[in-house]
């Protein structure tokens, strides 16, 4: 284990960090899969060869290279090699296909597109509509339907090139990650090296507190920023191994943890709940995992997870593609604080300030809900802008303050921030700010509710307010009625959580990353199938 000094901004680029690890931790394992184990020195050598091959294909500083790849070592090697040329890598969601995929590739305006054998059929389906970008295939081009595909192995066959690290600055855009598209077309977030690295040194590294012998186990898709912050890039900075798993599996998760002797992990979405819901075994606590992020879990689920598997769960925080670390429970403190609830977002970290603001960019009064905004105190804390979208970039700021789009409130006693809802999803009704996320969390507890989305419909009575609507997917064979669900919500939540409108639907509109496209629900509004509380027989209990 060798931890690179991040206090010097000259070190805050991934090519520089890799160079130091290759010098001082040459034989230390870095990237691990079932079939391969690469040391830092081997990764340095192979990325220098790849950089030479990419340069021969015309990749230069300021260019973009799109990567549509499954979880494997190649995506890491390519990302690092691309950065060595001063170019940016942009991952394409491996779930994309058809028009959604075509739109993403075209808007990248990439010099090169790299795809692997498992995903090539999706590119074949759209290749006649692509531009002039060259295509590199990780596989055999001779047996592929891709036209004029270039072999990835031919890039590795190039002689190494020497990289002048002084030409790469910590504020340069090194990656472009695309937002999920829940509000419309996805936006390309231009991220600097420092945007990534500050999130690790002030966030993930504090949380995991790595020691010699630690091994990271990553099951997250590599087009997701969390895979790099908690996995790849953190392993690079701390000089420890990172296992790259093809995908998450409930049935094999703990066996794989033990197989690789992994001590750290990070799991998102329903993964943690799936593990909790799996049948209990006598040896559930017999594993090597020491600490893991498990997001999101309720406080009750968190306790059950820690006790059952004997794994410490990292504490809360807030991050997004545009600002990979907004705040966390450590803040500027060196140790965890017991007086902060586990579900709190926490505090701003050393290089920034956080403030809750109204729609005009003015700070809200204490105990009021406001948009969480962050002001950098040092350069390159937030995004470098949205790619090819200056209008969206301008809208994302109140002067020096970046607007996260998240609503929060502050604890009057200890000053900790708490998440309320996405601003676009929160609604105001009868003078109250209602979190659609909280409404959904109540409705989903009904055993006959499979999926639910809460959103606002413009009120016909008060111009500035919205009526609450739920679109609900029932479980198979369910005969759940609107009135029964309304009563369930009424019995388990404040009376104003009972929706004015409700509609049973077969499915919810989703992005390829499985996020609900609420803008489509708002556009659809109400129809003949919509249940109206005021026209029903149900009386809300206050």
Where are these regions (language model features)?
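Conserved AMP-binding/adenylate-forming core of the ANL superfamily
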Residues: 8-10, 19, 27-72, 76-80, ...
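Structural core segment of the AMP-binding/adenylate-forming
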Residues: 19, 56-57, 84-154, 280, ...
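AMP-binding/adenylate-forming catalytic domain of the ANL superfamily
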Residues: 138, 493-515, 534-542
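Conserved AMP-binding A3 loop
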Residues: 39-41, 174-198
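Gly/Ser/Thr-rich phosphate-binding loop
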Residues: 237, 262-267, 276-339, 353
């Amino acid at each position: 284990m060798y931890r690179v000094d991040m206090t010097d901004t000259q070190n805050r680029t991934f090519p520089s960090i890799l160079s130091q690890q290759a010098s001082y931790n040459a034989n230390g394992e870095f990237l691990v899969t079932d079939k391969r184990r690469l040391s830092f020195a081997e990764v340095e050598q192979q990325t220098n060869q790849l950089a030479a091959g990419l340069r021969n294909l015309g990749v230069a500083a300021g260019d973009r290279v799109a990567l549509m790849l499954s979880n494997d070592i190649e995506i890491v090697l390519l990302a690092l090699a691309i950065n060595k040329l001063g170019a940016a890598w942009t991952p394409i969601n491996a779930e994309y296909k058809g028009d959604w995929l075509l739109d993403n590739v075209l808007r990248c305006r990439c010099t090169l597109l790299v795809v692997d054998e498992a995903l090539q059929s999706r590119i074949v389906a759209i290749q006649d509509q692509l531009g002039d970008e060259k295509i590199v295939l990780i596989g055999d081009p001779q047996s592929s339907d891709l036209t004029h595909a270039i072999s990835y192995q031919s890039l590795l066959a190039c002689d190494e090139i020497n990289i002048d690290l002084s030409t790469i600055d910590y504020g340069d855009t090194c990656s472009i990650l695309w937002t999920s598209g829940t509000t419309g077309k996805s936006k390309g977030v231009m991220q600097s090296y420092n945007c990534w690295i500050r999130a690790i040194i002030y966030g993930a590294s504090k949380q995991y507190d790595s020691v010699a012998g630690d091994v990271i186990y990553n099951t997250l898709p590599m087009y997701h920023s969390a895979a790099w912050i908690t996995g790849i890039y953190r392993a690079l900075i701390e000089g420890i191994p990172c296992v790259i798993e093809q995908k998450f599996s409930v049935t094999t998760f703990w066996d794989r943890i033990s197989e690789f002797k992994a001590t750290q992990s990070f799991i998102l979405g329903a993964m943690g709940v799936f593990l909790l819901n799996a049948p209990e075994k006598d040896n559930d606590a017999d594993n090597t995992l020491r600490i893991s992020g498990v997001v999101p879990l309720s406080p009750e689920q968190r306790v059950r997870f820690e006790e059952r598997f004997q794994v410490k769960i990292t504490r809360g925080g807030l991050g997004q593609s545009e600002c990979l670390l907004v705040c966390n429970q450590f803040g500027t403190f060196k140790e965890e604080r017991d007086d902060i609830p586990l579900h709190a977002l926490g505090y701003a970290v050393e290089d920034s300030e956080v403030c809750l603001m109204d729609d005009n960019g003015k700070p809200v009064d204490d105990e009021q809900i406001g948009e969480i905004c962050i002001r950098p105190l040092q350069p390159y804390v937030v995004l470098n802008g949205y790619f090819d979208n200056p209008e969206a970039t301008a809208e994302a700021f109140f002067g020096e303050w970046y607007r996260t789009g998240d609503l929060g409130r502050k604890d009057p006693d200890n000053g900790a921030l708490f998440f309320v809802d996405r601003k676009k999803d929160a609604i105001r009704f009868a003078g109250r700010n209602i979190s659609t996320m909280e409404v959904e969390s109540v409705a989903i507890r009904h055993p006959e509710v499979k999926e639910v989305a809460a959103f606002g419909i413009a009120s016909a009575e008060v111009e500035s307010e919205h009526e609450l609507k739920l679109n609900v997917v029932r479980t198979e064979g369910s005969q759940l009625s609107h009135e029964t669900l309304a009563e369930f919500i009424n019995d388990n939540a404040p009376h104003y959580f009972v929706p004015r409108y409700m509609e049973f639907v077969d499915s919810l509109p989703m992005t390829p990353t499985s996020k609900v496209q609420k803008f489509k629900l708002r556009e659809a509004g109400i129809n003949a199938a919509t249940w109206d509380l005021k026209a029903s027989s149900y009386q809300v209990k206050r």
